[in-house]
Amino acid sequence: MFFLDNTDSMTSSSRGITMPNTISSHEDVGGYSPRKVGIQHDYSAVGGGGAAFHHLHTSAATPRHVATSEFYDDEEATSPRGGIEIGAGGGKMMANLRRHRQRERETYEDEDVLSSSDESSGRPIPRYVGRDTDHVFGEFEMDDEDVVMRREDGYGEDETDEDYFDEEEPVAELLPLGGGTRRVPRTPGRKNSSKCGFFDYYKLTDEHLGSGAYGSVTTCKSIKSGVEYAVKIVDKQGETHSRKRILREVNIFKTCKDHPNIVQLLDWFEDETNFYLVMEKMRGGPLLQHILQRKYFTEEEARRVTKDISLALKFMHDRGIAHRDVKPENVLCTDPNHVSPVKLCDLDLASQRPPQHERHPLSQVASEPDLASPVGSAEFMAPEVVDAYVGDSLKYDKKCDTWSLGVILYIMLAGYAPFQGMCDDEDCGWSEGKPCEDCQQDLFHRIQDGYYEFPEEEWGMISEEAKDLVSNLLKRDPVDRFNADQILSHRWLQQSAASTILQTPSNLINRKDSARDVQQMSEHFNLMNRLADTRLSARFDNKMTMSECGSDLGTATIHGDGSFLSMGGEPFGTFPRKKSVGIAIEKSRSGEFTPPISRASPTTPPPSMLNLSEDLTDSPVKRRSADDSGTFSLFSPASSNGDDSICSPPMVFVDMPSIQLFGTGALLTSVQMTPRHTTEDDASLKSFEDEQENANPIHRIETQVNV
């Protein structure tokens, strides 16, 4: 086990090192000099509230680590292949990607890097690669400002960190956000008590905080103090998550130590099966969780979050580090009851490229050297990262992080993402976290085009200053995009923002003038990575006209199973089933489809039609909760031909199990119901409803659209 203590700064080659019996030498770990073994400080003051680590992303990426103070030349770029989460459907696309160039590399092995001082001192040569008997772990003193990263005297002068860390790793399969995570085997207990390891100082609890493609995050407790921490456990047996990659992450954490807006690494350990990264435990949850749960946010709260993230990015960018996976899941809140302050976490995909001040300082270049491997989460990827992923480009710079911040800010202010992917497949599961190559490609095209809108219905109440900042963050060209310094100096962050309600999914529906209705964020679906589910299952080329409505029949609740109940709970009818939806929509578009007309007997209620008011027909409208249910006002349509049939406008069936009542430019304004006719039908419907109620409680949107 390697620890950094508060001893003097002399090099390790001139200092005696105390190690466990199985380790009698030392190793240069990512630029850190090994120190004496032993816990020498108490972490009881660390943590202090904060957000639990959640949904860890550890997608494969080409490690890029530089420990010098100079930029590497642009020709040092690696292949534009990397890991992004999109899904099994993305694997086919990945297989068709072609590399534009590939460089020969020399692999750096631990046993090959030996200093002359090591050989002359008579100390055994460290050979940890491929040996199960070696047990290596380490710890850092986080409060010693004098302890800096240094290199061993004997670390080969001709070798660079690029040689050490530049390891080609396989491309990870693209998964939709929130989908396809793999479970990591539970960490085994300590087998040899004579070795000091993670379980000598900490014990795991049953509280699981999150998981990712290659690891999991769990709560652990210090055996000495009882203080809780979050431990990231990474399975070292995986093919793509190498030891060198972990060391790079540890090194970047060390560089970012003590920053108030970056989660702190406290310990790290390694045994024969896993890596253990012990970090401060945050208790406020990820920012995404707050967006989903809170009903009211203000521009002031959004401003504070933006400022905190910008401060973290400025700190990292000034040190040549790009985060490359900025998203709401990786922004952790310190307080469960407040959205700010926040801390940036998960540096697994970060890439370190310190600026070359002597040649061209950061402030004097429009675009910094490329970061090569495209990584991150799809909805938050900058256009240049998408270009690198699809092979249209071989480089992008640290401004990819400020684009991602722009997407987050847009979401905080509007409640949905500026860019979404969609397709025409009825059975597409993209919105539920399942892979869909068509949706993925559509999303990429939209991001590459860089086109987005500020719909008046949601953005009319948002200040022009906030919109201006979003516009400058979502610039297609990185040269024109704001950097962290420009963000922090923007007038919206320099003043106290107006107390405007943050339009999140919970409160969008309460606005009477809202045309782009709720994007219900439900944990019932795996939407922790997908902020905007706006795939339309019904589109119309021309705007429909409203028919005259008769008397108000009250408020009805639409259930996900298609049943329709009146306010009193009495069964009123059912919607057509899912299979008829596609045909109905397509034929209705072309004018070839006429919905079946049900004539009611004098003893039964007349057919009813669901209508939305005229002012809601200009933009997409969506009503949906966790089980696709919603609450609306019912009206009995006026009959234009003297009978009780529904005549105008033409109506189509709605895909109840997935999407209800949307359109683009032209809104579906009517849905025909099948009225009840017989006692047998009523009994059958009631039986079905009772069965559904016993199986799953019905969730409802608690407001209605008033015509």
UniProtKB/Swiss-Prot annotation:
PANTHER family: SERINE/THREONINE-PROTEIN KINASE. It is an enzyme of class 2 (transferase). GO terms for molecular function: ATP binding; calcium-dependent protein serine/threonine kinase activity; calcium/calmodulin-dependent protein kinase activity; calmodulin binding; metal ion binding; protein serine kinase activity. Expressed in pharynx, intestine, vulva and body wall muscles. ATP binds at residues 209-217, 232. The active site is at 325 (proton acceptor). The keyword ATP-binding applies. The lineage of its organism: Eukaryota, Metazoa, Ecdysozoa, Nematoda, Chromadorea. This is MAP kinase-interacting serine/threonine-protein kinase mnk-1. GO terms for biological process: behavioral response to nicotine; determination of adult lifespan; intracellular signal transduction; regulation of protein deneddylation. Signal peptide: none annotated. One of its GO terms (cellular component) is cytoplasm. Keywords: ATP-binding, Cytoplasm, Kinase, Magnesium, Metal-binding, Nucleotide-binding, Nucleus, Serine/threonine-protein kinase, Transferase. Residues 1-29, 101-131, 589-628, 688-707 are annotated as: Disordered. It catalyses: L-seryl-[protein] + ATP = O-phospho-L-seryl-[protein] + ADP + H(+); L-threonyl-[protein] + ATP = O-phospho-L-threonyl-[protein] + ADP + H(+). Belongs to the protein kinase superfamily. CAMK Ser/Thr protein kinase family. Its cofactor is Mg(2+). Residues 1-24 have a biased composition (Polar residues). Its EC number is 2.7.11.1. It is found in: Nucleus; Cytoplasm. Residues 203-493 form the Protein kinase domain. Disruption phenotype: RNAi-mediated knockdown causes a reduction in lifespan but not in a glp-4 bn2 mutant background. In an ife-2 ok306 mutant background, partially reduces the lifespan increase. In a rfl-1 or198 mutant background, partially rescues embryonic viability by restoring normal cytokinesis. Serine/threonine-protein kinase which is required in the germline to positively regulate lifespan. May play a role in body wall muscle contraction. May be involved in embryonic cytokinesis.
